[in-house]
């Protein structure tokens, strides 16, 4: 166990817990629900940018994505840059409308907005179930990614690393709530930027420059330096599918959408869009390029997801590697804490308080219940992550796709189409998510596109058809009422 690596990590985690304690103090002075779930809607532009980019740049950006770049070469780096406009697109499409609606209705969760917009409790229940299932899969990926990092860098077993990571995330989310999440996201986003730059420079330096690195990759496999990767796998259908899955479809991710309910004002939104796009550009290019070039430094890795932690040890001095370890840890922690908060809000706000609204008056009990739910979820995730796959990116993309198939049209058409109704939303959610799971489990790719593409098409058709049928049913009901 190398103290040079561990010491900076301990210092960093001290800052994280400090932020959580600060958030806890703030929480005790305000309304619990508003403070715990949306940080009293007080995010500045810089904080909004960092928390949105940090939440998006998860284990896949720092572990799974570079692992795929290690395996498939520079073509995957090009593919990864598709994700650059994500912050601009998500905040631009949802920002102002979500902010206005959430303030007007005092909404704290995505389901609050769904109930206000569609006036249907069954939609909220189905939404809650879909969210919990998809978040559980997505959070499992983050736990695996965090454990992989600690396992490789500080030399402990995978199980020990998993327990250490889970303990850290569970405790500071338990203490601090949403404000702790966005404060640590801001710290983490800054660490991510510098860590990415340092590792990329260290990798290129170890290889004797970019030209030398590319030559070494060519010697290993000439396909590693082509845009299409080994066996031409990165074809048009793959790239188009990937763009929909990790860029356009991100508008339908609820834990990204909830950020649009918590910023301070329009100035914060516009600044957040600009800064967030710059931050994501640096992270995506730097980490994936480091992963691809890492093949020339360490050509014989059996688990490609270990490329970043192995590179850290190989090309950086121990103290610098320790500082950089905080970067991917930051990315993973910032994603999982956001999803833990969202999952907790589903149980507490959308299910418990909707069934017992009078319980909201007892803030101490609600606070206790929220924290207990967070700890139970953390414990369940530990069990789910005990047997990890070799490449976590596919599991993460599966969770991404599930959320998008269920929620993209419900969110977008709900805020941009006045005639959208609950029948259309329910139809879209059931058909979109159902077809995605079915196509994925059966391994069916229509016209060689990823399953998310036909699922979104089916979901849109279902929304339009369900909406039309719903209009007729609503008209019949109105006629019966007026005839009385």
Swiss-Prot record:
Location within or outside the cell: Cell inner membrane
GO MF, one example: sodium ion transmembrane transporter activity
Membrane topology of the entry: Multi-pass membrane protein
One Pfam family it belongs to: SSF
Gene Ontology terms describing biological process: pantothenate transmembrane transport; sodium ion export across plasma membrane
Record CDD domains: SLC5sbd_PanF
Entry keywords, A to Z: Cell inner membrane, Cell membrane, Ion transport, Membrane, Sodium, Sodium transport, Symport, Transmembrane, Transmembrane helix, Transport
Positions of transmembrane segments: 3-23, 45-65, 74-94, 124-144, 162-182, 190-210, 238-258, 273-293, 307-327, 366-386, 397-417, 424-444, 446-466
Coiled-coil annotated spans: none
Catalytic activity: (R)-pantothenate(in) + Na(+)(in) = (R)-pantothenate(out) + Na(+)(out)
Family of this protein: Belongs to the sodium:solute symporter (SSF) (TC 2.A.21) family.
Summary of the function given for this chain in its UniProt record: Catalyzes the sodium-dependent uptake of extracellular pantothenate.
Protein name as it appears in the record: Sodium/pantothenate symporter
Organism: Haemophilus influenzae (strain ATCC 51907 / DSM 11121 / KW20 / Rd)
Gene this protein is translated from: panF
């Amino acid at each position: 166990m190398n103290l040079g690596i561990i010491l900076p990590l301990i210092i960093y985690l001290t800052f994280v817990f400090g932020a959580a304690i600060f958030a806890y103090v703030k929480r005790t002075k305000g309304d619990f629900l508003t403070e715990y779930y949306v940080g009293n809607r007080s995010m500045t532009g810089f904080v909004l940018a960092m928390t949105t980019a940090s939440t998006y740049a998860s284990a896949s950006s720092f572990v799974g994505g570079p692992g795929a770049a290690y395996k498939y070469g520079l073509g995957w780096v090009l593919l990864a840059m598709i994700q650059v406009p994500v912050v601009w697109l998500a905040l631009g499409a949802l920002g102002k409308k979500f902010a206005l609606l959430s303030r007007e209705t005092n909404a704290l969760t995505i389901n609050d907005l769904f109930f206000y917009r569609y006036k249907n409790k069954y939609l909220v229940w189905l939404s809650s179930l879909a969210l919990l299932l998809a978040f559980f899969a997505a959070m499992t990926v983050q736990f695996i990614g965090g454990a992989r990092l600690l396992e490789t860098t500080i030399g402990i077993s995978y199980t020990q690393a998993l327990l250490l990571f889970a303990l850290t995330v569970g405790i500071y989310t338990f203490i601090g709530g949403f404000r702790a999440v966005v404060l640590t996201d801001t710290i983490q986003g800054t660490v991510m930027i510098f860590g990415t730059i340092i590792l990329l420079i260290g990798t290129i330096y170890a290889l004797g420059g970019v030209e030398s690195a590319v030559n070494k990759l060519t010697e290993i496999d000439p396909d590693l330096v082509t845009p299409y990767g080994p066996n031409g796998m990165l074809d048009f259908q793959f790239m188009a599918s990937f763009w929909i899955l990790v860029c356009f479809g991100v508008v339908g991710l609820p834990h990204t959408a909830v950020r649009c309910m918590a910023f301070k004002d329009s100035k914060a939104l516009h600044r957040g869009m600009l800064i967030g796009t710059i931050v994501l550009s640096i992270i995506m290019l730097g980490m994936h390029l480091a992963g691809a070039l890492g093949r020339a430094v360490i050509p014989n890795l059996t688990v490609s997801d270990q490329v970043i932690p192995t590179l850290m040890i190989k090309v950086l001095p121990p103290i610098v590697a320790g500082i950089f370890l905080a970067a991917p840890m930051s990315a993973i922690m910032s994603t999982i804490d956001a999803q833990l908060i969202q999952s907790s809000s589903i149980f507490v706000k959308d299910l418990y308080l909707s069934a017992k609204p009078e319980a909201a008056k007892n803030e101490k009990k609600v606070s206790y219940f929220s924290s207990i739910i967070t700890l139970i979820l953390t414990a369940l995730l530990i069990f789910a992550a005990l047997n990890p796959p070799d490449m976590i990116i596919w599991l993460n993309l599966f969770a991404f796709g599930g959320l998008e198939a269920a929620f993209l049209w419900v969110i977008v058409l709900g805020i941009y189409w006045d005639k959208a109704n609950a029948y259309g939303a329910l139809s879209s959610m059931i058909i979109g998510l159902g077809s995605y799971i079915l196509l994925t489990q059966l391994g069916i790719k229509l016209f060689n596109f990823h399953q998310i593409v036909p699922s979104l098409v089916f979901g849109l058709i279902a929304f339009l058809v369900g909406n039309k049928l719903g209009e007729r049913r609503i008209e019949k009901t109105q006629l019966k009422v007026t005839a009385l």
